């Protein structure tokens, strides 16, 4: 019986260190800019992470989100950050990454508007709104405007109806120091 308990304990410890090692290696690939290698490593270790505790899973999903943000695959980044949040990662770790995702989405949407790819810009601006619905209402308005420019009137109407439902008026108060 003692051997069985000892064997189980050793197996658990080695399994836990393998998870952390894979996560560390993927993080090294990320910091060196080898995003595809990091994703491949995380994907190949998916079974290891699936059987791990929520803390390791949330760290893996946070890394997935960071990788997809860097690769401008914004929908997958949003999904990864959402899963990480649901698994209980701290807001202190998650909020800076969500801010980076917002910035990347806005920059990409502005680029799409400049190249007259209004449909893509509308979707990206809607994603910015979805990230923080309380503070990013104006981006939903911009998304609706981009949808109008892309001649996607049903989508624009949907966005304008959401704006009406949340009673968005577009009025801002700005304070100036004189």
Predicted regions span which residues?
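Sec-dependent N-terminal signal peptides
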Residues: 4-13
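N-terminal leader/linker segments that initiate helical-solenoid repeat arrays
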Residues: 6, 17-103, 114-115
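Structural register within alpha-helical repeat arrays
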Residues: 25, 64, 101, 108, ...
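Alpha-helical repeat scaffolds
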Residues: 42, 76-83, 120-126, 155-164
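Short coil turns that delineate tetratricopeptide repeat
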Residues: 50, 89, 133-134, 168
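TPR alpha-solenoid repeat register
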Residues: 60, 94, 138-139, 172-175
